[in-house]
Amino acid sequence: IMGETVTGKGDFSATVTLETQDAPIVNNLALKRGTYFTEADVAEGRNVCVISDTDAKRLFGSDDVIGMDIDVQCYDLTKSFRIVGITTQKENGTFVSYTYEGMPVTLSVPYTAAVDFVGDTADEFTSMVVQADKKMDSQVISKEVIKTLEKRHQSAGEDYYQLQSFQDVMKMMND
């Protein structure tokens, strides 16, 4: 969700990502301060957020901002989120991250906390990430995930679901 926020450091475009408590694992994030939001935060739709150390410094001039509130305006609605965690990207040697002037700041919030912004579509997902132990066969896991989704949504054989592996993404980037 795209929005805006204003702090003592200025006006910022904001990207609000709707996530579960498993986001640090999926996104390869390390906590620098505080905690990530919990399963209870997600279940109860608590207005909490996690931001990166880089964005904290852009927004507030420091990454020591645990417990502070940040107001975000999306779709003509302003909502306040309590900052519970500050992340830092783990070094993996594969990807390079750039920050540029005007780049949106990113707030990760429990997907259930975004109901005010997106209405009752907050529990409708357009994508998901599945991770497994590297010893497991990704083809088998992929087929089981599709089979489970088709069974639960009575859509067997309708090709509603698309698989995209890391290799598929890398191939698109290199083509």
Over which residues does each language-model region extend?
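Short amphipathic beta-strand/extended segments in non-transmembrane regions
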Residues: 1-38, 163-164
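A short acidic, helix-capping loop that chelates divalent metal ions and anchors anionic groups
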Residues: 3-7, 91-96, 170-173
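A short, glycine/Asx- and small/polar-enriched loop/turn
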Residues: 8-12, 43-44, 79
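Mid-to-C-terminal secondary-structure elements
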Residues: 22-37, 47-155
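Membrane-helix entry/capping segments
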Residues: 150-175
